[in-house]
Amino acid sequence: MKQGVTNMQNILIVVDMQNDFIDGALGTKEAAAIVPKVEEKIRNFDGKVFFTRDTHETYYLETQEGKNLPVPHCIRGTDGWQIREELDALRKTEPIDKETFGSIDLAGELTMIDEDEGIGSITLVGLCTDICVISNALLIKASLPEVPICVDATCCAGVTPESHENVLKAMEACQIRIIR
C-alpha cells in the first residue's frame, strides 16, 4: 500500500463470469442466481473494475487441469468462453485471460497500480468461489499484503454450496474479509 496517498483507488475484480460457469458445461443454479447481483455490484462500484476470463485451448483435455477435470469448458472463441453478455456490456478494459485458476498477470497489474497510485481496497466477486476466486484472492494477498482484500460472498458461487461456505472460512483465516 502506497504510503501518504490520500486518494487511493478501490478495485473490483470480477472473476470468470463466463457462460460455461453460469449455465454451460460447468454451470449451476447458484452461479446463475448471482448474475444480477454481480451486475448491480459493477454498476454501483466506485473504482476500477477488472474482469478475468478462464481461457483454455482445444487441447484442454491433455492438460493437467483437463486430466483432473475432464469437462471441456471456456475454450477460446466459443460461446462458453464469453463473459456473460449483460456483464460484458459494463466492461471498460480488456479481460485478463488466464490459463489456470489464478492470474499472476492480475496480481502484477495490481501491484503496479498500487506502486503508482495506491490501492485502498480490492474486492473480488464471481466464479467459482472454491477454485478461481480463492486462487486469485490468495495471489493478490501474497502480492499486496498491506492492501485490504475482501470477497463479497453474495456475489460468488462455488462448485457446491458446501464448498462455497468452506472456502469462505479458509479465506477468512488468511485475513481476507468476507462480505455476507
Regions found by a protein language model. Name each.
Residues 54, 101, 154-156:
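Active-site beta-loop-alpha junctions enriched in small/polar residues
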